[in-house]
Structure formats: C-alpha cells, structure tokens
UniProtKB/Swiss-Prot annotation:
EC supergroup of this enzyme: ligase
Organism: Yersinia pestis
Residues noted as binding ATP in the record, renumbered to the chain: 17-25, 43, 129, 131, 136, 194
Protein name stated in the entry: Argininosuccinate synthase
Known partners and oligomeric status: Homotetramer.
Length: 455
C-alpha cells in the first residue's frame, strides 16, 4: 500500500507545514480551492529571520485553513543540538571547519513534533515544501512515518496538477492576487536561506557556482567578518559545562536552555564564529554546496572539546570522534532516532559527556579566529607536574623509562625485519641515504604505485 499520494485527496484533512512564505501560502489556498480540507502547522524554531510567529497561523486561516496551530519546538531543538555537541555528531568538515548539522537537527524536531500535533487533530495526511532533489524530502518522510505509522504523504510539489497551474513563483504570486490577496513576492536573493535557532543554511542559485564565495552572503546570525570595514572587537568569553551540559556564559547561569543558546548565538555572532563553506554529499550521493552559520553551536563545541581533550584518555577521544562521525552521518540522513543512532548517542553521553565539567575561557576575534585562554576542571587528567621539563619530583624515574624503552626492542626488531622483507618483494627500495627501505617516490609521482610493483 503506497504512502505517497500523487494527487490531492478531496474532502480529506491535509496537514501542511506552513511557513507563511509564498510557496506554502499558495499551496494551502490552492488545496482549499480544489476541495481538500487544509490544516496548517507552523514550527517555532527560533528562526533568526522571523519577526512575528503569531502572525503566521493567522495568515493560514485567511488563506483557507480549517485550523492553524503554532507549535513551539525551541526547547526540543536546543536539547537535540546539545546532544549533537555532546556526541560530536558532525561529519562534514573542510580543513577543520565544521558544519554543525543544524538543518538536519531542525528537520528531526519539526518532522516529529508537527506530525504528532497533526495526529492530535486526526490529520493523517502531511505535506511540506521539500523538493524531490534534496535531503529534506527523505528526512521528513522518515520522521513522519516513525511518528505516525498511518501517515500518508501528499506534496503539492510532486503533484502534476499543482505544477501545471502554479509551477513558478510568478504564477503563485498571480494566483494569490487573483484570489483577492495583495501578495507581493519578496525581492529575490542570489541564494536561498533556511534557518532555525541553531544555525542558518544558505544555498542554491548563485551559490551553486563555486566561484561565488561567502562574500555574496548577508549573514543573519553573524557579521561579515571578511569585510575590513566591519568593526569586530576581540572579546573574552567563559563557557561552563556541568556533566556535559552548558550551564553558564560569562558567569551568568541559565536555567532556560533556549535562553542560553540565544545568548551563545549573540556572543558568537558578533564575530562571525561558526561560518563554514562546505561541499557535501546529499543522501542521494550527489554533491551540493552550502554556506552555514552556527555561532552558538560553534562556541559551545569549542569549549566542550577543549574540556574533552583534557579529561579523557586517547582511546576514549578516538572513539568519540569515530562514533561521532558515524552519528553525524546518520543525523544527516534523517536517522537521528533510529536504533543505531540511539545506541551511539547513549554510549557517548553516558561515558564521555557525563565527565565534561569545567570552564573554558576564549578570546574571540574575527570569524573562526580564536584563542583558548584558560581551561579549568576538577576532572582534568592533564597534570603538568607529571611531565614537567623542570628539575623536581617526578612520577617515574630515568631507570623506569630505560626499562620501558628496552621493552620496545622486540617490536623494533620485528619491524626492521619486515621492512627488509618488503625490499625483497619489490614493495620498497633500499636507501643508502637513510639506511632504511623506502617507498619509491619517483615511481609514485610518475603514476606507478605499489600495485604496479606487485605485478
């Protein structure tokens, strides 16, 4: 039995994720005129570019919605964002600059909370504005069906009748005007923007071309730190964590996690912290490009990982990074609530995040330029007296180290024998300069690698 409806279901309740923009406004009005019973659901995600959330449901009612609801998703969104920080659930990085998966986090919250609200209203058909080429269509599909097993999916943008009548923004605007609504299209930007309180995504249009840089973007959460005319003053900030959770900024304790994230955004945003330019692999394996903002997430992430490296041992940190990358990819794919993701989340939060208690002081400058000024924690295993280069008491003696090095002789002997065995098989070549077998870089640079030598 199919879950995707290709044509508008007449005389049935159809829920639509309603943003108040031209696309969803025209879709809602069109569905109502064609005989469906539209219900509008708007997620309050703390979007930095939204001025009046309360006005959005009122618009939906004007356009013909049977019912319109505003769902406050902010607290849940921040909870999921902090969980992602605790787990390092970020897999897209370029030269150490991270994308904080803010859109996938928003979809996880929206896709579950809106469908749960629809279920309360006995609405079992859902539509949203995602296109068939992107990631969101699959994310919403998964989260929707996980939340309501009886859910059917109807998307106007997959309905040929809708596309034939209102296939472009101009046609949508004319349709609204002809229907008695003085709806004017907003000025077209050179790119598309989607945001929530964790971060903003800028993509498409001019940004699809790699010779269009971050410089064409007007940040909505930060500043144009690349513009020399923009004054950005250095600023010190202290972040405190308790058992993996951020609790204070600059000595101010926040009981409300939403307010803490908003303040972190304000602090990081003053510097353009957390902006990144990424080429990534969509769920369908095609590459796309996005420019991202996430000032608060970046600030908390830096402080969290500073404490992490001072508290946990090398093997734990390695597992944190490895599992975090896997978890980040699952999040990106719309699998944040799947068992394989929950397993990784639980283990990292239980055994890694629970020990992250302390304070980190940073100096923020322009963009992602910062310095760590101080790190304080009762849980630090970093203890300078253990390895001090100065004369004094030590936890081990020179004789202890001699014994430890002597134990390495077995491994060194075995390794040396293997290297010379590789010379005999042709995998390595002898080197008079170093006395050790070496990879033949001349062969590698001419296009011949180890596989050629095996033949």
């Amino acid at each position: 039995m199919t879950t995707i409806l290709k044509h508008l279901p007449i005389n049935q309740r159809v829920g639509i994720a309603f943003s108040g923009g031209l696309d969803t406004s025209a879709a809602l009005l069109w569905m109502q005129k064609k005989g469906a019973i539209p219900y509008a659901y708007t997620a309050n995600l703390g979007q930095p570019d939204e001025e009046d959330y309360e006005a959005i449901p009122r618009k939906a009612m004007e356009y013909g919605a049977e019912k319109a609801r505003l769902i406050d998703c902010r607290k849940q969104l921040v909870a999921e964002g902090i969980a992602a920080i605790q787990c390092g659930a970020f897999h897209n990085t370029t030269a150490g600059v991270t994308y904080f998966n803010t859109t996938p986090l928003g979809r996880a919250v929206t896709g579950t909370m809106l469908v749960a609200a629809m279920k309360e209203d006995d609405v079992n058909i859902w539509g949203d504005g995602s296109t068939y080429k992107g990631n969101d269509i699959e994310r919403f599909y998964r989260y929707g069906l996980l939340t309501n097993a009886e859910l059917k999916i109807y998307k106007p943008w997959l309905d040929t009748d809708f596309i034939d009548e209102l296939g472009g923004r101009h046609e949508m605007s004319e349709f609204m005007i002809q229907s008695g609504f003085d709806y004017k299209m907003s000025t077209e930007k050179a790119y598309s923007t989607d945001s929530n309180m964790l971060g903003a995504t800028h993509e498409a249009k001019d940004l699809e071309f790699l010779n269009s840089s971050v410089k064409i973007v007007n940040p909505i959460m930060g500043v144009k730190f690349w513009d020399e005319n923009v004054v950005v003053k250095a600023e010190e900030v202290t972040v405190r964590f308790e058992r993996g959770y951020p609790v204070a900024l600059n000595g101010v304790v926040f009981d409300d996690s939403v307010e803490l994230m908003m303040e972190a955004n304000r602090i990081g945003g003053r510097h353009g912290l957390g902006m990144s330019d990424q080429i990534e692999n969509r769920i369908i394996e095609a590459k796309s490009r996005g420019i991202y903002e996430a000032p608060g997430m970046a600030l908390l992430h830096i402080a969290y990982e500073r404490l992490l490296t001072g508290i946990h041992n090398e093997d734990t940190i390695e597992q944190y990074h490895a599992n975090g990358r896997v978890l980040g990819r699952l999040l990106y794919q719309g699998r944040w609530f799947d068992p394989q993701a929950l397993m990784l989340r639980d283990s990292i939060q239980r055994w890694v995040a629970s020990e992250i208690t302390g304070e980190v002081t940073l100096e923020l400058r322009r963009g992602n330029d910062y310095s760590i000024l101080n790190t304080v924690s009762d849980n630090l295993t970093y203890k300078p007296e253990r390895l001090t280069m100065e004369k004094g008491d030590s936890v081990f003696s020179p004789d202890d180290r001699i014994g430890q090095l002597t134990m390495r002789n077995l491994d060194i002997t075995d390794t040396r024998e293997k290297l010379f065995n590789y010379v005999e098989t042709g995998l390595l070549t002898s080197s008079a300069a170093t006395g050790l077998p070496q990879v033949d870089n001349n062969n590698l640079s001419s296009g011949r690698g180890l596989q050629d030598k095996r033949q």
